[in-house]
Regions:
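Hydrophobic positions within alpha-helical membrane elements
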Residues: 102, 252-253
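DNA target-recognition domains and sequence-specific DNA-contacting regions of bacterial/archaeal
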Residues: 1-6, 58, 62-204
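Non-catalytic DNA-recognition/assembly elements of restriction-modification systems
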Residues: 3-77, 92, 96, 202, ...
């Protein structure tokens, strides 16, 4: 038999209490984010969602193409034959990085400075809005730092900072429409950059978009703050667990 050491029962209970405190805090922040996102979405629906392209619009409102709200960028993957193009410098966003995330805090892959410079025209600044447009269509997320994406993602760099929340919710509610646009009689959904750029949407008066930004921006910033805290708590908990179980870190009984 191989002897196995393990913490005493009282120490196991202390370890469980520590880990539970992390889980409870994470769940609390996740619940808070859900409430905050629903609040911002409710305000958006009340202000904007009742109007569609083709409807009679309020005075001063109109219809504009998506490209009128910002610069459209289609992502690209650097040559994989050059290993120097990949590293830990620039987040490289792919569709799995976007699932159920308002903000993209981390990515599974990253580019080197050299790799990013090889396609510098694909660089996205912070607060760009990414939309998945091939295969899995209609996911919408916001960048939190300078990033690039692969070719399955179209992004918009808003012309004005106060467009961010309006564009996020406008694009989020277009999921079914984007799926219809991308069907094209093929098995794989694909909304190409030209089609994406020419999507028409209701264009409210700019001062109304600004007012919505004033209300929703603090909500989005709180969601981002909570997400950052969740990320830190999760990494700390996961790093602590093996050390607690191995006895490398001991807790008082």
């Amino acid at each position: 038999e191989i002897p196995v050491s393990y913490p005493s029962l009282s120490e196991q209970k202390s370890i469980a209490a520590i880990l539970t405190s992390f889980d409870d805090k994470i769940e609390l922040l996740q619940a808070q984010n859900k409430t905050l996102e629903e609040l911002a979405q409710t305000i958006f629906k009340e202000w904007f969602a009742k109007y569609k392209v083709g409807d009679k619009l309020p005075d001063g409102w109109g219809v504009g193409k998506l490209s009128e709200f910002g610069k459209i960028i289609c992502g690209k993957t650097p040559s994989k034959s050059n290993e120097d193009y990949f590293g830990n410098d620039i987040p490289f966003i792919k569709i799995p990085d976007m699932h159920n995330k308002v903000f993209i805090l981390e990515t599974t892959d990253n580019l080197s400075i050299e790799g990013a410079k090889s396609q510098n025209n694909k660089m996205l600044p912070k607060n760009s809005i990414c939309i998945s447009c091939i295969a899995t269509v209609g996911l919408v997320s916001i960048t939190t730092k300078k990033s690039q994406t692969n070719q399955q993602i179209n992004s918009i760099i808003p012309n004005e900072n106060y467009f961010r929340e309006f564009l996020y919710f406008t694009l989020t509610k277009m999921k079914n429409y984007l799926n219809d646009l991308g069907s094209g009689g093929t098995a794989t959904l694909n909304v190409n950059t030209s089609t994406f750029s020419n999507i028409e949407l209701v264009k409210p008066k700019e001062d109304i978009i600004k007012d919505f930004h004033k209300l929703s921006n603090p909500i989005f910033e709180k969601v981002l703050q909570n997400n950052t805290q969740i990320q830190t708590l999760t990494k700390t908990r996961d790093a602590l667990l093996p050390k607690l179980m191995s006895g490398e870190i001991r807790v008082k009984k």
